Amino acid sequence: MVVTTEAVTSRSERDAEPVQEPLVEKLATEELNILVAVRCRGRNEREIKAKSSVVVDVPDNGVTNEVSINTTDDVGIAAKMNSKTYTVDKVFGPSASQKLVYEEIAEPLFQDFIKGYNCTILVYGMTSTGKTYTMTGDEKLHNGELGDAAGIIPRVLFELFDTLEANKDDYLVKCSFVELYNEELKDLLDSTNTATNSDNKKLRIFDSNVNGTSASGSSSRSSSRNNSPRSAPDNSRAQMLRRKLGRHNTTGNSKISNNNHNKFSRFKQTSQESTRAHASNNHQNVHIPNNNSNNTNQQQSPIDQSASIYIQNLEEFHITSAMEGLQLLQKGLKQRQVASTKMNDFSSRSHSIFTITLYKEQNGELFRVSKMNLVDLAGSENISRSGAMNQRAKEAGSINQSLLTLGRVINSLADKSEHIPFRESKLTRLLQDSLGGNTKTALIATISPAKMTSEETCSTLEYASKAKNIKNKPQLGAFIMKDILVRSITSELAKIKSDLLSTKSKEGVYMSHEHYKDLHYDIECYKTELEESKRAIESLTAQNAMLQQERLSLKDDNACYKANIASLKDNVVTLQSSLKEQITKETNIRSLLKDVQGANEEMKKTIHLFEFKQQELQQSISTFISDEISNIRDTLKKHIEYLQNNGDLKDTEISGNLMRLEKEVVKVIKAAEEEASKSYGECVKMMLKETPRLFESVSGRLDNISKLAEENHSKIAETLSDVSEEYNNLKQYLTNNFFKNNHEELLSHHVQNTYAQLEENSAQLMQNFTMMLDKHIQENKRHMLENILGVTDEVINNELQMFGEQRAKWEKSSALINQCDSVNHSFHQALGSNLVEIRDVVSSSRDNIGATISSIQSRTRNRQSIEEMIQGNDVIRQQITRIKQKNKSLSLFKEHSTETATTSIGSVNKVEGNLKVIMDKVLNDPQLSRGKAEVPDEELHRLEKIPLGITNKENVVDLQHRYPALQEKRKPEDEVLLQAKLQRRNPD
């Protein structure tokens, strides 16, 4: 919203007359108790010199809600038992800082004030207890900032404008400062309060619902009890009003131009209107006659819609910054009544109310009005103790009287009496809405811990505890239309112009020497700044051309950087694919290791089965041979006995021959049995000897392979983790940070905005400074481009420096990948050598076992049968021949003997057949002759394609070409069997 001169002149007198619209929004809320806090200071020098003991028990640090006072002379436990305890909302000890008090008490009320509620903070207590220190404190700035001792009022001012600027809402802020001294009101900000016009400017309290002087058009609102002061003629500049009521587009980059523009605007307005009314920012002292007749309505604020109690002739000052408000506070404090007493060197002799009125944009054309009253009450004092005399005694009596009335009001409100004596004192009338009204109120009671002031301390705590029971019903402030606010400001400006014109027509404008010096100093400053602006514009023009060249250079650099980024992205994609391949290889290694371990377990099971079969075979052979030999012996004995019983063989010596025959047969059978047992024993021993050695070697090689695989896996995992981390960092940096600042657009946008802003600011100076303005713009532009160029170089250097670190990390990740490949290659070579050794051991064991089996087979073939052995025995043949010769005479028994021999031969043949069956069973057992299994060509071809090593994925055929030891395409049976087992366990 912008207030223009045309709008002011086009308004009719009816529009200039303030009219209040019925747009008051009162939101009823629940009743709230007054927030009561107690602040206890430490003992001062007077109390320490008087050796007054501490009788108040409060925490030195932190915040509690209880305070105890010892009203007796007891000490120790008795003192604690007889102490009187008061409960309030907050209790602050001597070490509590000003910041802590503000955050705990004033900060919540300040937030409500911003939301639109009327708020009041009162400081109450005995003299010299720190009321003014709590409310005002150190109001001076130190290095442009508030000190630690700053009180509530300075902190509220600074936080108010910080909050409003952060919210970026339209707003208007006014301040007033009133003093109640000896039951008389005084405007502490009125610099024209002289003896000649003191009667005209006398402040009076009015009640709008009973006094007909409320000419602002507001209806009687008896339910609203607002004690805020009324508006006086506005003394702020029209430029300030336009800045706060309207949205302006000035930026922080054109600070020099804005300062020049503001200073020149103030100078121009001063030269045209000759003066300003109460210009608090520049400490000007303009004397304007007060034509107050028939103007009572104009001095009342037309925007204070809900006020029921107001102060006539109290001036409100527009402020646009916390510094301006702080200057008003300091100005009022200088005029406040202060005196020295025996209890306090700087004792406030009056009550003061500093009021901040906020008009804040709510919804478009509506502004909400809220007030914050910061009340510093004078301290009650004992006249005999303070040494007050004459005028000081009168002041003390007036202070005590007003505080006594305040105490009665607090008691009446706490007891919920029907009659509340607000009108018995001007102080209570001003605080009427703060006590039991529609505001949010906080009371800070200040006390002394010394025993010499225990009575006053008890009285203060009694009032504080009773005030805690007072309930207020806070309501949001009223709404006001924006055009009504503009009409009010227009009316005030019109009155100021009228007063200035009347003053000019009489005797000119009176201006103080200080004001004149300020104006003269401002003019000299303007001239100096104009000269500097000329030089700045010239330099800015030259640097503009340089900046254009830099811009083209930056475009080329940007293209190069984009190409580098594309190349880096390709490298990142390559690295990512390499990482995936390494992960796949690692997975294959793990799978192969599991398969080898499974094959090892299966071979161990086969060994156990072989040992079991060997024991079973030995037992079976031993049992069978023993049974058959027993049967043969029994048969031969039976036939021999039969022959002996049926013939006389002594003469023919058949019995001797038979005995020798029997012995020779038994000898041959035992020799055959021993030879078979020896052959099978040697075979078994050889197999038992070779098999553990074979599997021990295989197990050792497998352990080596497992260890190598684990080491390789850990190295690869660590390396891949580092590579992945560096890759993610590089990717995040390239995505989020690398040249994402749009430097070209920022530079172009910044230059255009700066140039447009300079032109806009210069438009208002074109009337008198056309030629100088062009040079001023060029010089400012040169300075701005110079600064922008420096910032651009710094940004680019920072980007390149940050990218250098990322690039170094990326190169490090490439080295890690190369290291990973080297580790994989070493593992592949070690794995190949171990597999070759395993194959050699398996082949050697296979050859040994095959030789043993061949030896057994050759021995078996050499021993064709028992019959051939018997027939080849000369002794047996001779004995049989002799028997035949001797038995020629025994014709009757020839056939029987032949049958007996035939039966014996059949039994021997049966033994021979059974031995052959057993040998065939041993030699043809599928579980003991797996080494002879043949693998089909298709299966062998498929086994040859199984990956050996995962780095280069070489198959068996490729590996045979590399290692001479594996030139054979057909692998040994045991290796084929191992590969088949691995294939069955992992068919993919």
Swiss-Prot record:
The keyword Secreted does not apply. Residues 33-470 form the Kinesin motor domain. This is Kinesin-like protein CIN8. One of its GO terms (cellular component) is astral microtubule. It comes from Candida glabrata (strain ATCC 2001 / BCRC 20586 / JCM 3761 / NBRC 0622 / NRRL Y-65 / CBS 138). GO terms for biological process: cell division; initial mitotic spindle pole body separation; meiotic sister chromatid segregation; microtubule depolymerization; microtubule-based movement; mitotic spindle elongation (spindle phase three); regulation of mitotic sister chromatid segregation. Residues 206-301, 965-988 are annotated as: Disordered. The lineage of its organism: Eukaryota, Fungi, Dikarya, Ascomycota, Saccharomycotina. Residues 208-237, 281-301 have a biased composition (Low complexity). The keyword ATP-binding applies. PROSITE patterns: KINESIN_MOTOR_1, KINESIN_MOTOR_2. ATP binds at G125, M126, T127, S128, T129, G130, K131, T132. Residues 248-280 have a biased composition (Polar residues). Belongs to the TRAFAC class myosin-kinesin ATPase superfamily. Kinesin family. BimC subfamily. Keywords: ATP-binding, Cell cycle, Cell division, Coiled coil, Cytoplasm, Cytoskeleton, Microtubule, Mitosis, Motor protein, Nucleotide-binding.
